[in-house]
Amino acid sequence: MKKKVLALGAAITLVAPLQSVAFAHENDGGQRFGVIPRWSAEDKHKEGVNSHLWIVNRAIDIMSRNTTLVKQDRVALLNEWRTELENGIYAADYENPYYDNSTFASHFYDPDNGKTYIPYAKQAKETGAKYFKLAGESYKNKDMKQAFFYLGLSLHYLGDVNQPMHAANFTNLSYPQGFHSKYENFVDTIKDNYKVTDGNGYWNWKGTNPEDWIHGAAVVAKQDYAGIVNDNTKDWFVRAAVSQEYADKWRAEVTPMTGKRLMDAQRVTAGYIQLWFDTYGNR
């Protein structure tokens, strides 16, 4: 869920510059925050600083535990082509056309209006489904490297809409500015507390169309939005600029719903991967 956030190009000229501020809960000796925050060294192959990869890996773990519904040769293929899968997950945030010239417009999708935050831009539902299908075409053509790269891309967009801010078009420039990125940094610090430990993915959850799965995930995520972004958490986040107490308060407030979202994301992702294999079959 971690988001590399929103340089909006010319649109940023319409937004007042952000004041540089060291948040009370940051322990890096005074990290400064601007429109594009300085992220920790996110690594395409290290899930500790890559929540998208963490969710996909936990989903594969779920699949590996379910020897009744999941053919284990599918898990073997995911592991065989893990590097390509991880490259796709990572590229979505760092390469064009996937990150939309640093606007990340295609990483958002509001299920109520079917749009991202930029008018007429591609959104996560259509983009995630596009790469799901391209992955399938490559798979059928036995181009496994390209297939699993595209699958990684698709899984990234699915992962985004499981994050309530992405399902409500709440960007890093939404008020309070910077909340989106600081929240996603926080998620990295607690995610290991919410690992699914069983083999129960959301199998056959939303039919056979990837669009329906991405839409369904966004619907559920947006329902949980108020548990993360609300008047209290916004106020406490602003106060956290000078107060450790308020930094602790907003983090504590968002933790229960964040845990729920992380667990749902793992189960949905397991089912989505299973759908892909069901759709395009084994070699």
UniProtKB/Swiss-Prot annotation:
Prosegment location in residue numbers: 25-38
Molecular function GO terms recorded: phosphatidylcholine phospholipase C activity; zinc ion binding
Necessary cofactors: Zn(2+)
Disulfide bonds: none
Positions of Zn(2+) 3 binding: 39, 52, 160
Lineage top rank: taxon: Bacteria
Keywords, alphabetical: Cytolysis, Hemolysis, Hydrolase, Metal-binding, Signal, Zinc, Zymogen
Chain positions recorded as Zn(2+) 2 binding sites: 166, 180, 184
Enzyme category, top tier: hydrolase
E.C. no: 3.1.4.3
Membrane-spanning ranges: none
Function description: Required, with sphingomyelinase, to effect target cell lysis (hemolysis).
Name the UniProt record assigns to this protein: Phospholipase C
UniProt organism field: Bacillus cereus
Species lineage: Bacteria, Bacillati, Bacillota, Bacilli, Bacillales
